[in-house]
From Swiss-Prot:
NCBIfam families: ksgA. InterPro entries: KsgA/Erm, rRNA_Ade_diMease-like_C, rRNA_Ade_Mease_Trfase_CS, rRNA_Ade_methylase_Trfase_N, rRNA_adenine_dimethylase, SAM-dependent_MTases_sf. This is Ribosomal RNA small subunit methyltransferase A. It is an enzyme of class 2 (transferase). Belongs to the class I-like SAM-binding methyltransferase superfamily. rRNA adenine N(6)-methyltransferase family. RsmA subfamily. Coiled coil: none annotated. GO terms for molecular function: 16S rRNA (adenine(1518)-N(6)/adenine(1519)-N(6))-dimethyltransferase activity; RNA binding. It comes from Mycolicibacterium vanbaalenii (strain DSM 7251 / JCM 13017 / BCRC 16820 / KCTC 9966 / NRRL B-24157 / PYR-1) (Mycobacterium vanbaalenii). The gene is rsmA. It holds the Pfam family RrnaAD. It is found in: Cytoplasm. PANTHER family: DIMETHYLADENOSINE TRANSFERASE, DIMETHYLADENOSINE TRANSFERASE-RELATED.
C-alpha cells in the first residue's frame, strides 16, 4: 500500500491541531510538496536494505516518503512537540510502516553513536539552514557507516559544498566535506514548496563516501587536515607560502614543506584541493614533526576504524 504524503493544507491543519508555530531559532521550514520529497528520496537511491538517518523531520513530509521506499528510518528532532507528534502522524498515513520508524528527541550537533542501537547506512534530510554545515560534518565523522548522503540546504551552501578548487564559492566546507567522499549538486528547490516560505532557494547535494578512503580516517589525522584547511582559508588570497608560515614556523620552512608535497608555494590556499591538504600534512610528517594540540595523543594515522569525531 502506498503511503499518503502530506500536502500544503494538511501541513497547516496539522500544525494548528497541535498549536504549533515554526521557530526561526530551529530553522523550521516544512516541505509540503509531494513531488519534491519524492524527488529527494529518488535522488538518494535508498532501498529496503537501508537504515536512514533523517535530521529535523518536522511534521513528517520527508519521513513518509522515506518509509514509502521500505527503508528503516531513525528521525532525530530537536523540537519535543514535533518529536512527540511524528509517530501519530505516520500511523495516521500508513499501516505497519510506523514500525520501521524510531523518533529521537535530540540535538543533532551532539548526536552520537551511543544514541542508536543500529548504525545508519544513509543520511537523508532537509537540514536546518542555521546548522547545515556543522551538522553534516559532524554526522559524516561520527557515523562512518553512512555511505550515502542526500541533503537539502540553502542554495548558497549547496554551491559552496559542491564548489571546485579555485572557484569563487570554494572554501572551508568544500574542502572538508571532500575528506569523506565525492560531492555533486542535484538541482534547486523553489521556496514555494515550503511552509513558512523562506526568502532563499534551496539546493540538493549528494555525497557518496569513498568506498576505500585514500587517506587515514582516524580523528587526529582528520583534525590536523582540517586545521590546515582553516589556516589556508583564514587569508585565502595569500600565497600558500605566507598562509602556512606561522604553522610551519617561518616562510622558508613553509615553502620547503609545500615543495616536499609537490605544491607550488606561490599558489593561493583557495586553489588547494583536499588531496593537496592531505599530501602537505603527510609530507610534513615525514619532513618534520607536525605540531599537535596539547591534548592530542601520539598520532595513530593507520587506525581507520577510529570513529570519535574531532571537528
Amino acid at each position: 500500500m502506498t503511503i499518503r504524503l502530506l500536502g500544503r493544507t494538511e501541513i497547516r491543519h496539522l500544525a494548528k491541531s497541535i498549536d504549533f508555530r515554526p521557530r526561526k531559532s530551529f530553522g523550521q521550514n516544512f516541505v509540503h510538496d509531494a513531488n519534491t520529497v519524492r524527488r529527494i528520496v529518488s535522488a538518494s537511491s535508498i532501498n529496503r536494505s537501508d537504515h536512514v538517518l533523517e535530521v529535523g523531520p518536522g511534521l513528517g513530509s520527508l519521513t513518509l516518503a522515506l518509509l514509502d521506499r521500505g527503508a528503516k528510518v531513525t528521525a532525530v528532532e530537536i523540537d519535543p512537540v514535533l518529536a512527540n507528534q511524528l509517530p501519530t502522524t505516520i500511523a495516521a498515513h500508513s499501516h505497519s510502516e510506523v514500525n520501521r520508524l524510531t523518533v529521537l528527541n535530540r540535538d543533532i550537533l551532539t548526536f552520537k553513536q551511543s544514541d542508536m542501537t543500529e548504525m545508519p547506512t544513509a543520511l537523508v534530510a532537509n537540514l536546518p539552514y542555521n546548522v547545515a554545515v556543522p551538522a553534516l560534518l559532524h554526522l559524516l565523522a561520527e557515523f562512518p557507516s553512512i555511505r550515502t548522503v542526500m541533503v537539502m540546504v540553502q542554495a548558497e551552501v549547496a554551491e559552496r559544498l559542491a564548489a571546485e578548487p579555485g572557484g569563487k564559492d570554494y572554501g572551508v566546507p568544500s574542502a572538508k566535506v571532500r575528506f569523506f567522499g565525492n560531492v555533486r549538486r542535484y538541482g534547486m528547490v523553489s521556496p514555494t514548496v515550503f511552509w513558512p516560505i523562506p526568502r532563499v532557494y534551496s539546493g540538493l547535494v549528494r555525497i557518496d563516501r569513498y568506498e576505500t578512503s585514500p587517506w587515514p580516517t582516524d580523528p587526529e589525522f582528520r583534525q590536523q587536515v582540517f586545521e590546515l584547511i582553516d589556516v589556508a582559508f583564514a587569508q585565502r588570497r595569500k600565497t600558500s607560502r605566507n598562509a602556512f608560515a606561522e604553522w610551519a614556523g617561518s616562510g622558508n620552512e613553509s615553502a620547503s614543506r609545500l615543495l616536499a608535497a609537490s605544491i607550488d608555494p606561490s599558489r593561493r590556499g583557495e586553489t588547494l584541493s583536499i588531496n593537496d591538504f592531505v599530501r602537505l600534512l603527510q609530507r610534513s610528517a615525514d619532513w618534520h614533526v607536525v605540531p599537535k594540540p596539547e591534548s592530542a595523543a601520539t598520532a595513530v594515522a593507520t587506525d581507520e576504524d577510529a570513529q570519535v569525531p574531532t571537528l
